[in-house]
Amino acid sequence: MKKLIEPFIGGYRMKAFIPLCIASLCSVVSAQTSVPSGRIVPTPIYGVTVDDVSRLNDITRSLSSLAYRPTTRIVFDEFVNPDYYRKPAVEISKVSYVMGEILDSYYVKQYSVDAYIQRTNQYLNALSDVVDIWEVANEVNGEWLGANADVVAKMTNAYNIVKSQNKAAAVTLYYNQDCWSKPANEMFKWAEANVPAYMKQGLDYVWISYYEDDCNGLKPNWQQVFDKLRVMFPNSKIGFGEVGTSRKTKKAEYLTRYYTMKITTPNYVGGHFWWYFRQDMVPVTKELWTTLNAAIKAAPR
C-alpha cells in the first residue's frame, strides 16, 4: 500500500452485505462487449498519478511536456464533492487521458456499501465526459479495506454502474506475494474467489499495484505474474496500476526499471501510474521529471 502524503486527512477502513446482482443488470453487463463510449486510450499506456490537484498549471505543464501523451490517475479524495475536481479534470484532460479513482483503498472502510454506490453515481454524473477510465476498486484485495463481503459489494456495484453507462472500468489488485497478513488476501487467491465471472470477462483494465518497500524488496518474475493474470482476465488490458517508493535514493532506479520493463504477455499495456508524480515531477524542472521522460522514451512499444 502506498504512503499517503501531502494534504491527506487520516483515516482507515468498513462493514457487511453482498448485493444481489439484479438479474437484468447483470445480464446486460456480462453480455456487454461493445467498445466503451468516450475517448479510446491508446497503448502502450504511460500512466502517472496525481493525488493533489493544487498548483494545477504546474501539473498540466509537467504532463504536456512529456514525450508521449500520458494517462493521469486523479485520486478523488474521501468525502470531497465531485464539483471540486471539475476544473482540474477538464484541464488535465486537455493534455492527458484521465483515469478517475473513485476512492483510494485506504479510505474504503470509511464508506458503507450504500455510500460507496452513491459516491460512484455522483462522480460519474459529474465527470463522465472528462474521465476515460473509471477505477472502480483500488487495491481491492488489501487486508485493510474492511469486511470482505462489503468490499466485494462495493466493487461489483461500482462496476455495474460504470458499465451500465458504457464507460471503461478498471480494477486494481494489490500484489502481495509472501507479504500478505491473511492467506485469503493473496492477490490471485482473492481475485479468483471474489471477482465474479462476468467481471473476469468484462473488465476493460486490470491493474497490479506493487510497492517493493511493502514486500521486503521482492522483485517478482513479472512475466510469469502477468501471464497468469491474463489467464484469469482474458479480455482485459493488463499492466501496473501503481508503482513507487518513498525512498529518495531509489526513485530514479525504480522509475527507469518499471517504465522500461519488457513484458510480452498479450494485452499487457504498461500503465505504471507512478504514485508520487505530483510530489516528484511537478514542476517540470524537477530532476525526476527528466528521469520519467527518459524512461517513457525508452519504454518498449
Predicted regions, residues:
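Sec-dependent signal peptide recognition
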Residues: K3-E6, M14-L20
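Bacterial N-terminal signal peptides
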Residues: P19-S27
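N-terminal substrate-binding region of glycoside hydrolase catalytic domains
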Residues: T33-L124, S128-E143, T245, F273-W274
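Distinct, well-ordered alpha-helical segments
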Residues: N57-T60, Y85, V113-Y123, C179-M199, ...
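Surface-exposed amphipathic alpha-helices with a cationic face
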Residues: P88-S93, M155-A170, Y175, F226-F233
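Aromatic- and acid-rich polysaccharide-binding/catalytic face
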Residues: G100, D132, N138, L173-Y175, ...
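An active-site-proximal structural segment forming one wall of the substrate-binding cleft
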Residues: Q110-V136, D150-K163, A184-G202, T256-T265
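Substrate-binding cleft of secreted/luminal carbohydrate-active enzymes
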Residues: G239-R301
